[in-house]
Amino acid sequence: MAQSYVGQKRIRRYYGKIREVLEMPNLIEVQKSSYDLFLKSGDGPKAADGEGIQGVFQSVFPIKDFNETAVLEFVKYELEKPKYDVDECQQRDMTYAAPLKVTLRLIVFDVDETTGARSVKDIKEQDVYMGDMPLMTANGTFIVNGTERVIVSQMHRSPGVFFDHDKGKTHSSGKLLFACRIIPYRGSWLDFEFDAKDIVFARIDRRRKLPVTTLLYALGMDQEGIMDAYYETVNFKHQKNRGWVTRFFPERVRGTRPTYDLVDAATGEVILKAGEKATPRMVKKWIDEAQITELLVPFDHIVGRYVAQDIINEETGEIWVEAGDELTMEYDRDGEVKGGTLKLLLDQGITDIPVLDIDNVNVGPYIRNTMAADKNMGRDTALMDIYRVMRPGEPPTVEAASNLFDTLFFDSERYDLSAVGRVKMNMRLDLGKPDTQRTLDRDDIIACIKALTELRDGKGEIDDIDHLGNRRVRSVGELMENQYRVGLLRMERAIKERMSSVEIDTIMPQDLINAKPAAAAVREFFGSSQLSQFMDQTNPLSEVTHKRRLSALGPGGLTRERAGFEVRDVHPTHYGRMCPIETPEGQNIGLINSLATFARVNKYGFIETPYRKVVEGAVTDDVVYMSATEEMRHTVAQANAQLDEEGRFVSDLISSRKAGEFMLNPPDAIDLIDVSPKQLVSVAASLIPFLENDDANRALMGSNMQRQAVPLLQSDAPFVGTGIEAVVARDSGAAIMARRAGVIDQVDATRIVVRATEMLEPGEPGVDIYRLRKFKRSNQSSCINQRPLVKVGDVVHRGEVVADGPCTDMGELALGRNVIVAFMPWNGYNYEDSILISERILRDDVYTSIHIEEYEVAARDTKLGPEEITRDIPNVGEEALRNLDEAGIVYIGAEVQPGDILVGKITPKGESPMTPEEKLLRAIFGEKASDVRDTSLRLPPGAYGTIVEVRVFNRHGVDKDERALQIEREEVERLARDRDDELAILERNIYSRLRTLIMGKTAVKGPKGIRAGSEINEDLLSTLSRGQWWQLALGEEADAKEVEALHEQFEAQKRALDHRFEDKVEKVRRGDDLPPGVMKMVKVFVAVKRKLQPGDKMAGRHGNKGVISKVVPIEDMPFLADGTHVDLVLNPLGVPSRMNVGQILETHMGWAARGLGIKIDEALQDYRRSGDLTPVKEAMRLAYGDETYEGAFGDREDEDLVEMAGRVTKGVPIATPVFDGAKEPDVNDALRRAGFDQSGQSIVFDGRTGEQFARPVTVGVKYMLKLHHLVDDKLHARSTGPYSLVTQQPLGGKAQFGGQRLGEMEVWALEAYGAAYTLQEMLTVKSDDVAGRTKMYESIVKGEDNFEAGVPESFNVLVKEVRGLGLNMELLDADEE
């Protein structure tokens, strides 16, 4: 049987000890699920949930006109098929999008003039086109105007209520001023805050502050209601000459020394003398035994307390004291009572006074003091006050003020807490509101103020805004939803105006709607939002990381300048949710993060991480996902805690964490355990082997630099990996996976044809054609190229790799190459992290990469006439046109240099008046060349290479040139070949099924020459053509029906195939949608091979970066005793200070891997000589260890084993997962098995002298990457070029073809050396002395050497500047005195 491809994969020796319970989730799930939810919200039963497109339409519609005689309702929406597929959009610079059709219903009412009753007069329904909705590609990106873009997820503060204080910064005394803020998803912010005098204020939208009682009055509360909401009431009963009887609070006395005797009101005995301490034991006795409930307190004890309710004269209705008034006694000079509210009440015979329970220790008088300071007393004045703050300068009326206040927080159109906000608010304030209530209500506001005053009283904690329970992720779907809502709201205004201005009876919904604002909002979001980014496509890892990025910047987020240290810092809740390592260096550090490997985003937008459940000290395989808030309640053990066979903890105390603190706990106190040791880092960091031995700063650089690795000509998976390389390659979409199981039918460089053997859906064709991308340009100009891995006849299973992409090798991520390195100094060439390389690297194309640049030219229709793409260019010699075809477009395969013409183009220029002679010549010869100028596309300076692809686009109705027709023919041929192959496989498939169906059956009738009733066998079928098989009618009805069904299926699939083909051909032949005014466009792709050269940047995976200093001949490089030459020489001093020791362990491990590979190679040579497989088996067992060997190779066929051994002769790949990988003993063991010294050092000889170096040197195999900072892209030189208009100095920078700046410090240097003439030259003729530089250029051309320096233009600019200030400067010659 044909070897299944699975058996050929390279097997890694896995060093991890901890069993993986959970598969790593799809790495770009964040993007996909979010956008799917947005687009498909209308499908299925959950449509009314208010999210996605459905939710947006439901929130904006129905739209009523101003006098409510008509209403426009939303019925449903539907996304149609996109016009072009992904590839076509990329080629044609279009946006990959689907038309959005919305069904709207217009209802017109009849309104009865007299009664005002409404009756339905007319209902019209119609589908309306609402612009295009961009679609996400299979890899989680968007194609916008032909380029791939990614929408980055944003971290923002979760809606809800937050409590905080100013850390004592506001007031000079350092007093903590508490504040509370209600943040909605959209709408006005509401703040409550204390000032230094302990009065509570409210602010709306950060405006001027109002006393909080004003807000409470506006909510319809009165003074008594406010007091009742915030304070308990205590009654004081007056007993003549004895004092007051009041309730006893034993808890408040505990541990204090009262200033008065405590007297039990019931018995009259003194239970505690003044100044004595109340011990807890006494308090317990009073509660339990004596059961004292009331105390008798001295008379003056009530003075200074506040009345809880209005106390009214029942007969006259006169209010004696109002709620919140202070009880006072006023004395005259002699100490006689002369007034005060308390005297007034006692005089009126009131002995029972309800008082607010404010003791200034446990409960403070903040709300009561605020009320006293507030000049408003009722709802109307409070509303007017709020109106004045919100709309300063407008005259307030009660009605307007009331409307404004209602719309601020209680109108679902203007204010939305969102489900998250409501859930967070319920949790923080212990409310039980349903999460469908998205606006505020009175209880919410009262509860917030209550919680704030309790904070001031010392109860409760403030919130930590950097806690991941208070920050949430907004992914693509949600960002898009908000943007679309903005567009629809803009549209709504226009619809309302139009509804009231037209004759509503006669029009359809289509006429009311102008979808431009909605479409524009979407386009603006994808084109220019801060979160819509040009995809980083350098390699597959950079793509995956870009899609998993979390940014705190962007609209509605932070700004770099304002973000403090706290926001950027690593927080305990980041564990398993956001990577603590991977973040940019520079001003964005900590603001842009990466999602951890196992993390996912829940429906509320909080990041969750998985844990295994622990039940009574035993670890189970149940996995639960937890958000940061839920995790606070649990005790979590680390993944590397030691377990026995049954999954119980081995030690008595286990390192664990709870609520952000680390502690040691006994096994039975533990609820959860981490799923995997790598769950706390991101994808890029988990690709670094021996990460645990690296310093964090260097690990950060390592993670970031892996994303800049350039795809090389030959990829090479690392010997020392971490085991997740295959996952990254799979999820990035770089490698091609089989969609379903099948057998390989055809393979060539551009496509793989698979005959499917499993059906995923009935009726789909039994053929999969995988088109490979060949030498396509990525966003970063690196090369995307896919290569098949399978042979004809191979059996593939679903989800298996059939082709490698850029930076992948056998389906594993391969960013660099394994090279032999030595850590030693070499003549100072590796000073300061420089790298010395061997010429072998250039000779064998080890680090050679292909870069593809795209150049385009458009022929427009100008005022003076159309531009033309042609070979006929004025004043250009035949030599310059050697690479162009008759249409004026460069050939594929031409080698081009800077300045070469790629596409010839001429532009008409303005007519100049002609002399009579010219007119005569023009009339005789029809000479036209004089009135056009050459505007051809030329290769810019510094670029060179080979033309690999040319595309020509024509406008509708413009005749195609020969080149365009040729490209079109090739494209149609390719499509036809695809169709024919698919048809051939389909026929083979169907006819083989038909044969098995009819074989051995009896034919009732058939084509000519077949007798009725004859048995169908091979001989009979061979006399007929395959098409005639269908004409054999079978006797059994069931069989006949089956044949008929098969025929139907065959015909249907054939029709579908033809239809698809016709459709594609029609698209190819149709003209292209070009921008207005463009008649024709040509794109030319130039590829260049870049070898490694001095000045290029390289790096390892541990943050060890360096620049190449020199290329040394192979024979001069240091070599080992067996004659192996070293490829790279690195500086050993780069290791100790940087503390990234992981690279040394990697070097040793790689050396062992190579050694074991050599042993396998020798065993294979033995086998080829002797035919005995034993040495190969032994070598494989030595390399992989018994366990892996038995599992992977134990039951293999011999030729399989030989093939698999042949794949690892260069080095045996190993996997050492982060935080759970090989330790030092494992490295020693690997070196020993490979037959090397356990020190990892070797005797090395000098290549130039052949002498041995003084001491052994660390030599090993290391995985090194070539980064995207190539010297070819940076080096640039200018002789003459463009000048700045004002100063006439040369421009700066490579892009402008600028010069080198000679700044003031350089001038000082030349002055210091007294180089007067050099200095004069630099400041005049080489810069901005216009006349001088022209003369100098002339004299150089003539070969003379005289020039004179004049006045620099910048001096004239200075003079003009001074004159602009009103000072006239005149310059006099020295001669003129």
Curated annotation (Swiss-Prot):
GO terms for cellular component: DNA-directed RNA polymerase complex. Belongs to the RNA polymerase beta chain family. CDD domains: RNA_pol_B_RPB2 (cd00653). One of its GO terms (biological process) is DNA-templated transcription. The RNAP catalytic core consists of 2 alpha, 1 beta, 1 beta' and 1 omega subunit. When a sigma factor is associated with the core the holoenzyme is formed, which can initiate transcription. Its EC number is 2.7.7.6. Keywords: DNA-directed RNA polymerase, Nucleotidyltransferase, Transcription, Transferase. It comes from the Bacteria. One of its GO terms (molecular function) is DNA-directed RNA polymerase activity. DNA-dependent RNA polymerase catalyzes the transcription of DNA into RNA using the four ribonucleoside triphosphates as substrates. It catalyses: RNA(n) + a ribonucleoside 5'-triphosphate = RNA(n+1) + diphosphate. HAMAP family: RNApol_bact_RpoB. This is DNA-directed RNA polymerase subunit beta. It is an enzyme of class 2 (transferase). PANTHER family: DNA-DIRECTED RNA POLYMERASE I SUBUNIT 2.
